[in-house]
């Protein structure tokens, strides 16, 4: 049986199945929901079988049929191979665009202050940063490589540990102009605690409650204080003297070195169970452009 050209229809089907929504698939593919629905219906007509169970009400309106679910891994693998083939064509030249996904805070506090050295080594390569807290689909969003913070396991991606992390209290030097202030951890009971909520939903993400609990500080109320969902903004609030932040060492490194922040109680160690990982799709390790950035990340992190 001759295979007709149905790549757009297959892409619409795969995205609709992943999102369980024509509207969400349309947003990803930059077309209208009606166009996605038409592409899926054309594929169903050609196959002679429905690909989705459609509901008129409820939270999920679109569920792939059993046959469609069985076919999806092969279809996704096929798109991955096509994407990799295009990447190999790009490698005919050292130029092009490398798309890198990182969190907004990691971009601001670690990557951007250091990336000039990568541009100096690879002047013909442009880097496009996709800053996002959510877990993006590398294939659908055309992501080449990224740095993720977490336990080190993400389906469909190679993950190589880049950096471990420690957490500790920090504050502005101006808070310590009163020499009697913040002499012991118990003194935190009289300070505004700045909370990092950027990964609050992850049970292993270090929090003030975990840090205070480890020390058994009964008088420190960890439910109060300033709550911010961006690690860079957490540090900026501390720099501005708004209170004491529980800083992530990778994010706070430059601010500590520049004297904008001071680490409190350095004798207390609290290692995060999470770490930073370089992530990319399997099979991409042979792409020189991508591996150049990967190697630069590891060389820079080791300094």
Regions inferred by a protein language model and the residue ranges of each:
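C-terminal regulatory
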Residues: 140, 154-271, 302-303
């Amino acid at each position: 049986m001759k295979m007709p050209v149905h790549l757009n229809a297959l892409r619409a089907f795969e995205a609709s199945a992943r999102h369980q929504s024509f509207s969400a698939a349309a947003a990803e593919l930059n077309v209208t929901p009606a166009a996605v629905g038409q592409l899926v219906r054309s594929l169903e007509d050609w196959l002679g079988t429905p690909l989705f169970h459609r509901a008129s009400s409820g939270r999920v309106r679109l569920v792939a049929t059993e046959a469609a679910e069985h076919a999806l891994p092969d279809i996704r693998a096929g798109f991955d191979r096509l994407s990799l083939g295009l990447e190999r064509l790009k490698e005919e030249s050292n130029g092009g665009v490398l798309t890198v996904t990182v969190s907004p805070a990691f971009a601001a506090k670690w990557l951007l202050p250091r990336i000039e050295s990568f541009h100096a080594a690879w002047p013909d390569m442009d880097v496009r940063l996709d800053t996002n807290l959510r877990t993006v689909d590398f294939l659908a969003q055309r992501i080449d490589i990224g740095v993720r913070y977490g336990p080190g396991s993400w389906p469909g991606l190679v993950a190589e540990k880049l950096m471990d992390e420690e957490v500790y209290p920090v504050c502005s030097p101006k808070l310590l102009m009163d020499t009697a202030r913040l002499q012991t951890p118990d003194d935190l009971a009289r300070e505004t605690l700045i909370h990092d909520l950027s990964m609050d939903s992850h049970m292993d993400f270090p929090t003030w409650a975990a840090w205070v609990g480890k020390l058994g500080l009964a008088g420190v109320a960890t439910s109060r204080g300033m709550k911010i969902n961006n690690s860079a903004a957490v540090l900026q609030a501390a720099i501005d003297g708004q209170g004491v932040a529980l800083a992530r060492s990778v994010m706070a490194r430059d601010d500590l070195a520049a004297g904008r922040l001071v680490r409190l109680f350095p004798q207390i160690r609290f290692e995060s169970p999470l770490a930073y990982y370089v992530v990319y799709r399997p099979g991409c390790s042979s792409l020189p452009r991508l591996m150049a950035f990967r190697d630069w990340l590891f060389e820079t992190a080791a300094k």
